Amino acid sequence: MTRTLWDSSLGKKTVMAVSGLIMLLYLVVHMIGNLKIFFGSGEFNHYAHWLRTMGEPFLHYEWALWIVRVVLVAAVVLHAVSAYQLSRRDIRARPAKYVHRKPRASYATRTMRWGGIILGLFIVWHILDLTTGTVHPGGFQSGHPYQNVIDTFSTWYGNTIYIVAMLALGLHVQHGFWSAAQTLGAGSATRDRVLKTIANALAAVLTLGFICVPVAVMTGVVS
Amino acid sequence: MKLTLRVWRQKNADAPGTMSTYEVDGISQDMSFLEMLDTLNEELILAGDDPVAFDHDCREGICGACSLVINGDAHGPERTTTCQLHMRSFEDGDTIDIEPWRASAFPVVKDLVVDRSAFDRIIQAGGYISAPTGTAPEAHAAPVPKPDADFAFEHAECIGCGACVAACPNGSAMLFTSAKINHLNVLPQGAPERETRVLDMVGQMDSEGFGGCTLTGECATACPKGIPLPSISAMNKEWLRATRKVRR
């Protein structure tokens, strides 16, 4: 059955849909966690520490966090590899373009591939910035995420990269959630309107929820 | 009406093609698009030139033979087949671009004619039912619920013209394949091959070199028979069900 899935274009799309939904679920949780920054450094840092102790005493320190990390890396890799292979297939299937061209499909639909690449690059920067601290502006302090977040969003490039990436995320989620639902067979004439509404709502909530953090730092609401 | 036509001319499958410009005059608004091309071809023949090759058959909008991309739209600006498109949809003095279906699975044979036998092979892979031979069975022997009959009929309307593939930026045949699968899979007559049908037809679709679906919705917009976009989701559901049920 694994072979059937991976060898078929529909199977690869299923892999894309499921891995995308896993990442989407994570993003909703991540966004809610981020919003704790509005309740001050104590609550935010306490929440960040809990992420490492979650599951104790059944799980050892940081085990739960590492399980989440492994699942996410697997999802990103599967999503990217199937996207690459499916895109190659799509481009091969339509080698000659029409002379008479018309702009088609929504902006979100047309930017799925480049948007995905932007998000991939953003994830690398985001981890190097706020998880490992490799490219963090100022001194990265492990265990003081509140201060680290403020450092990042006190630079113009930190804000620019983050906000552009979150806009790309919104577009990607808007078309991606709807497409994933169709791929998994949830689409029908009666349900499509609801699915599109959920996709639009998810895209808007995630984008606004993430962007309000740098905006709050820029405007001094969080300092 | 006087029109300027820019038509894709290509001698054969291996020759490079190009857009050639022609002027046609004396076109009536009541002519169909194909009759307008007939007029052009008569002039070309009288002038000793090679007439423009294009597919057509019934000219009643039910056979699926006609296939032109007109000003970037499969079957032109109206939601119908090219043979049912009339010149009243255009203005006097218009320039009209006419191109063949574009997809690597539909190679150009000559001018505007493409080879659509990939669709035939998808049908051969499972677009049939196992029926006993002999006299026709009693029509009421296999009851079909009304919603299922409607669903089957909606998809049975597909005439296999290939406009979905031509309109899709990925050259995907998913709307065609899903119409054929859904039409038979929902009916009791199609039940014996329900799982193998979807697996084999999707497998054939993949091996013909069609692209995948990215839900742009261009296919359903271009379809002259109004096959809806959720057809593809229904096919995906059937395919996922079949992969769980069938061990191979």
Region locations from a protein language model:
Chain B
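Eukaryote-biased recognition of intrinsically disordered, low-complexity regulatory segments
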Residues: 1-23
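Structural beta-strand/beta-sheet cores of well-ordered domains, especially the beta-sheet scaffolds
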Residues: 3, 20, 64, 94-96, ...
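Acidic/polar N-terminal loop/beta-strand segments that form early-domain functional surfaces
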Residues: 8-10, 24-27, 57-59, 71
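Short, contiguous acidic and Ser/Thr-rich linear segments
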Residues: 20-32
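A basic, amphipathic helix-loop patch mediating RNA/tRNA/ribosome contacts
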Residues: 40-73
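A generic, well-ordered mixed alpha/beta core segment in the N-terminal half of proteins
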Residues: 63-118
